């Protein structure tokens, strides 16, 4: 009673196709697919960037501590 049957879904799809047309729906689908692909690519690249940034920060910290020790010894 509370669920949506297959016939109701088919009627909704038919109305959407009549309102927007197949060409507009096709471009909308391809745009959505490209957006998802770009998002996945960005998410895959982000941890690499974060790892490099943390390594650079660690190297800078180590270099700074080394320079401070050299100044204290001099």
From Swiss-Prot:
Topological type in the membrane: Single-pass membrane protein
Lineage of the organism: Bacteria, Pseudomonadati, Pseudomonadota, Gammaproteobacteria, Pasteurellales
Family: Belongs to the TatA/E family.
Protein name: Sec-independent protein translocase protein TatA
Encoding gene (name): tatA
Primary localisation category: membrane
Keyword Cell membrane: yes
Domain of life: Bacteria
Organism: Actinobacillus succinogenes (strain ATCC 55618 / DSM 22257 / CCUG 43843 / 130Z)
Stored Pfam families: TatA_B_E
GO BP terms: protein transport by the Tat complex
Presence of keyword Cytoplasm: no
Subcellular localization: Cell inner membrane
Keywords in alphabetical order: Cell inner membrane, Cell membrane, Membrane, Protein transport, Translocation, Transmembrane, Transmembrane helix, Transport
């Amino acid at each position: 009673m509370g669920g949506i049957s297959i016939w109701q879904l088919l009627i909704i799809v038919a109305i959407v196709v009549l309102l927007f047309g197949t060409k507009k729906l096709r471009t909308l689908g391809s745009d959505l697919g490209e957006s998802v692909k770009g998002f996945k690519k960005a998410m895959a690249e982000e941890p690499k960037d974060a790892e490099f940034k943390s390594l650079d920060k660690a190297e800078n910290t180590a270099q700074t501590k080394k320079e401070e020790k050299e100044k204290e010894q001099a």
